[in-house]
Amino acid sequence: MSNKQIIGFDADDTLWENEVFFHQAQMKFIELHPHIKDPEEVIFQIEKENIKFYGYGIKGFILSLLEASVRFSNNKTDFQNIDKIIKIGKDMLAQTIQLLPEVEETLRHLSEHYMLIMITKGDLLDQQRKVEKSGLLKYFSSTEIVSEKDEQTYLEILEKNNISPKDFLMVG
């Protein structure tokens, strides 16, 4: 195993903005359903139930919003609302990457002294798109997109990259 120190970085909301776009999309959705009581809580519960089916990411989020729209309308949601929800999702997928302050300078400096790897969770195509558009790939020796971040996943990534856990630090 390598004795070089390695730093792993999460991507969403560690390197670039992400959660803010989900919040904005949720607010647009709520505008379509102003009659709902506690819409954020209802949406959160539907999302939570659906993670096992759709995983994390924009597509699963939009499918959950579509399901919420059907539930909120007693199975009478109209096609215009469905179209608006799909547009919300497409707008999210087309969003430009907004790096968090000083991220690139920090990665540039750290990459001169440490091996950096990116470990991010979410939908494969969406995460690949964000990673490529970020312009940060040049700082990372490896990029891992996973469906869940748990101890087993980290151990598999470390083993695959020949990294000892004692030489590894995860940020985010």
Q: Could you tell me what each predicted segment is?
A:
Residues 22-30, 62, 66, 124:
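An amphipathic alpha-helix signature
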Residues 151-172:
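Conserved Lys-Pro-Asp/Glu-containing loop-to-beta segment of HAD-superfamily phosphomonoesterases
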Residues 59, 77-117, 151, 155:
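Short, acidic loop-to-helix structural element flanking the phosphoryl-transfer center
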Residues 107-117, 121-145:
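Substrate-recognition/cap helix-loop segment adjacent to the acidic, metal-dependent catalytic center
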Residues 41, 48-91:
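A metal-dependent, Asp-based hydrolase signature
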Residues 6-8, 117, 169:
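Hydrophobic "anchor" residues on beta-strands that sit immediately upstream
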Residues 1-44:
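Active-site neighborhood of HAD-like aspartate-dependent phosphohydrolases
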Residues 2, 112-114, 161-167:
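Glycine-rich phosphate-binding loop signature in dinucleotide/nucleotide-binding domains
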